[in-house]
Amino acid sequence: MNTALDDLHGDLVTLEDNEIINNSDHSSSHSTSHEEEDEEEDDTEDIELIEKDGNKILSSRIHPEDEIINDGLNIWIPVQMLKKNIAKFWSHFLAIEKKLTKVKCKHCGEILTRSDASLTKTFRSHLKTKHNISANKNFYSMNFTVGDSNLKNNTSSTEITRRHGYDSLTFNSDQSFKCFDIGKLQSSNYLSISQLVAIVIASENLPLNFFENVSFKSLLSKFHRIPPLTTNIIEESIIGLSKSIDELIRRSISRNDTQLPFTIHLSDSKESNQPLYLKYSREIRAQLSNLDLSHLISVNFTELAGKRSLFSLQLFDNTNKVSKGLPLSIFVRKTTDIDISVWQEQLNNLYSKYPGLQKSVISITLPQSHYTMVLENRNSHNFTFHSGSVREIKYHTCIVSELLHCFLQPLFNVPTESMLSSFSVAKENHSGGSLLDSLIDFSHIDLSSTILGKICCLIEEVNLNDSLKSDFLLYCQNYTQPNCNELTSILSCNCDRFSALKSILEKFANLVPFFKSINSHLENESLSESDFRLINTVEETLRTFEQSIEYFASSAPLKFTHTLVFIIKFELYLTEIIRSFKFTKSKKPFEKILARLLKVKDLYLLDDVNLIGAFLYPSIFQSKSLLNEIFGTTSVNKIVHNMTKIVLRYLKNFINITNFRSSNSGGESGRNSGNNLLSDYEAIFMKESRDVELLCNTKLTAPLTEDSLLVQIIRDDLLRYVNRIAHELPNAYHDYLNDNDISFDGSHFTKHELSEENDSNSGEWCLNPMEETFDIHIPISDSIWNNYISSKNKIEVIDILLQLLSVNSTSSIRSELSSLTANQDFSTKLSEETIKIKLLNSQFNLEKINFHSGSIFDAC
């Protein structure tokens, strides 16, 4: 990467004299990474050489013939059996013809198409965004067997579609359903057969009498001494399991009640000959490094359909590095209006149900509408919420609800009352749908004044005009045979779901040449050149919007390190779009989105947790503009100075120092804290200035207090972190960009894509700010944190901050809840109980749960 971040190692003055930083860790870490790369390259097979014989075994575990699938409509064949000398990314796909305009992903089964036979961006992007797989990675060199492939089952999809009822024992479960070994669970002595059957029924939204299914009875007959099952027994088992989950949560919370705040006890200083500052610092660091934060929790508040509200618990699974959530309670609201007193009453009822919760929760995340009212009322006499052991509860606005309010009204004229803070009414689950289908119901929204309304009018006119319709079908047929069915389906467009709207825009983008050709034959309003351009821009923006929603609603860790930077990058993305349009009419919806997004940014800049997250976003030190935007300066010294105050304020919520003996002697505490550690940003990162004032050269003259002691420790650790990032960031960018065929000219990232014939006729394009964020900066930041978490060289304060950020929730809207709207009837008798069982089963290891005396954290 040709950037000003190169050669930073020589510009940093470290804390080696204070024995805080060991530079050998950086070099060894980098060396190890290169060794791992070499090993990977040795293991990677050269697919171009192997593919010369289509019948040859490409792997000792996978045969190409085993991957051929007949879905009843097409025969899907591994690409290397259709074409020779192809790029490695093709090994991840199946196709039905040599043009490769339509392929099926081996990992998830999704069917992808491309409009131009020379473009492969769609396929490469799918591998990266959906599966986090580099386009340079050979499918056959990956560490799995054919049994792991989503395409192993060759059963015809049409045959499956024709099956009805439960006699077939075909489960249409969502992807989060966790399969488990009934035999193993039975042997654990914690769950009876009736409970196991209840888990299956609740997890799959099956009727209570599902156990009467002939095939299921046959399965149960394989076990000995099966007790008789009735509908009442299953119902009682579901209720009993739900109560057991509640008790499991109560036990887990009660343990936190005894831990918060974390007490750091200092030993008696009278018998020590060490300077008081050094003695206390070492004791505090030793105890900070041993703090167990794995049992901390936060609370999410979400609105469901039918005037129902859901409170859920969120924790961080340190083993699998993901956040997980469990429902606590569902409350029924009297009206759809937002009433903060009603919300507080619900919260108090929640505390009554889970007595330890009030003293153990560290933050609450709310939808945008509720968050605003909480801020307005938190200082009023009527707002009686007490945070318990945590000195100041942190409230966070749900970023997903913020994005929904920013985008939906300007683009689709969605009225505010139609934008539920969370999930819309339950409706049929559509295959290939979007998470956004469960967040907003478009069926009653008037799109006539939007660009989608124009498209619908145009399609309607084509449908009514036999001549135009005939020309359209002929165009689709000549366009490309595999895509014919998909493109012609636009004639029966349905705009009741987000995924349907997105599909219409995607198909229309492929049909622009046809609609341009018939413009002069249209009786109604035709589309102008600016309209066609607007359609392409809206389609691209919606893809980015959907990707953003799915990311922040996911279980990915450390999303708080991305929120502020993400919003600023989206602001830049929208600004570029607005500048590219000449006409006010085209600019208007994007200007509305931008105005709303700027308000969200201002709100997030007031949140200490978001500021801490931004500081801990490694890639922020790759951009002076980001530092200026968030911290108001590019001076690392000033940034660290301000962040030290913020971190101190935040950590004092959770840490209590006891047996501290203050010192009135400034000389005892007056030391060089990290002397000559760090110069300014320009000297460290940009190599433009060496004449800077070092904050760390100053000596402490004030009396030693608890706060001044913590300030020294926090500042030292923040500086150690910056030093570490400055060593690792250039290498991380260099390696990642090389691996993904991306170049950087100092201001723009350019993606270089090989054609399907490999080296010849390669293409390239400049990445927009959001593509940079999702395709470059977030993966690099996550990689740096993965390396940090797995290393032994930890930084105490940074480690604590990361654990706290992992527990806090950026969004109260979680993707695992989206399946509830597809099949869940909230009016049924066992709705809350079923939801609890379903989400427990989908996220936790049931084999590890002791429902009698265990904790929810034991099941991670």
UniProtKB/Swiss-Prot annotation:
Additional comment: Present with 1050 molecules/cell in log phase SD medium.
Family: Belongs to the VID22 family.
Protein species of origin: Saccharomyces cerevisiae (strain ATCC 204508 / S288c) (Baker's yeast)
Gene giving rise to this polypeptide: ENV11
ZnF (BED-type) residues: 84-138
Region named Disordered: 19-45
Composition bias, Acidic residues: 35-45
Any single GO BP term: vacuolar protein processing
Membrane spanning stretches: none
Protein name (database record): Late endosome and vacuole interface protein 11
Keyword RNA-binding assigned: no
